[in-house]
Design a protein with these regions (language model features):
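Secreted/periplasmic serine-hydrolase-like ester/acetyl group-modifying domain
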Residues: 1-37, 41, 141, 147-192
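Conserved, well-ordered alpha-helix/loop/beta-strand core segments that scaffold catalytic motifs
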Residues: 1-83, 88
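Generic detector of bulky aromatic hydrophobic side chains
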Residues: 2, 42-45, 53-54, 81, ...
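Short, loop-centered acidic/histidine patches that primarily coordinate divalent metals
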Residues: 47, 95-98, 127, 135
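Short, surface-exposed, charge-dense and proline/glycine-enriched linear segments
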Residues: 72-81, 119-131, 181-186
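Flexible internal linker/loop segments at domain or repeat junctions
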Residues: 84-117
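Histidine-centered active-site loop/cap adjacent to the catalytic His
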Residues: 112-163
Length: 192
């Protein structure tokens, strides 16, 4: 499939060597405080990686770490926002869930087809970027193509509900796409 090269790189590199830690989270918190103190408006988001990455993380037993990373992000944003007036609150958007965009079918490499939403499994195209900007800025997207809302604001009030929704959607995706899950498993087996 078209994404195999990138997925293998992640499986052998970043995901295989992943060690949970808070160093980057602490750096983010310091940066958010600096930006807020300087009066800079930021629009942070979790990238809409293709679900093959989420399922690869699940196959590598990293999906709970990913969920915990999201929880830590929400905690950081909540703590930073405590020190900010209402008009300066920083909103964290999550576009990484299961949507019509992130579940786009991956073409076979031999078909040489272009995908509507992705350049590769971790790089969305400018059309997706435009939809994301519209969502974050509160504009009606010109290309409202998704029946399921794309992107959600993460807060301490909804993070666990969103993670549970991702888990449900993963189970549904796995049931509906067994060949994709089997392909990921075979790819991981070939790396051992």
């Amino acid at each position: 499939k078209a994404f195999d090269f990138i997925l293998r790189r992640y499986a052998m590199g970043m995901y295989a060597k992943y060690v949970p830690g808070d160093l980057h989270i602490r750096h983010l918190e310091a940066l958010l405080h600096e930006l807020a103190d300087a009066g800079v408006t930021v629009y942070p988001f979790i990238s809409p990686i293709h679900v093959t990455h989420l399922e690869l993380m699940a196959e590598m037993n990293l999906i709970n770490d990913y969920a915990n990373w999201k929880r830590k992000l929400v905690q950081v944003f909540s703590e930073v926002n405590q020190d900010l007036p209402a008009q300066q609150q920083i909103v964290l958007w999550d576009f990484s869930g299961y949507s019509e965009i992130t579940t786009e079918k991956v073409p076979d490499l031999q078909q040489q087809q272009f995908m509507r939403w992705y350049e590769d499994s971790s790089h969305f195209n400018q059309d997706v970027g435009g939809i994301m900007l519209d969502r974050m800025l509160g504009r009606q997207s010109v290309d409202s193509v998704t029946e399921i809302p794309f992107g959600v604001v993460l807060t301490s009030d909804n993070i666990d509900v969103q993670i549970e929704a991702d888990q449900r959607n993963s189970r549904r995706y796995r049931l509906d796409n067994p060949e994709e899950i089997s392909r990921l498993q075979k790819m991981l087996d070939s790396l051992e």
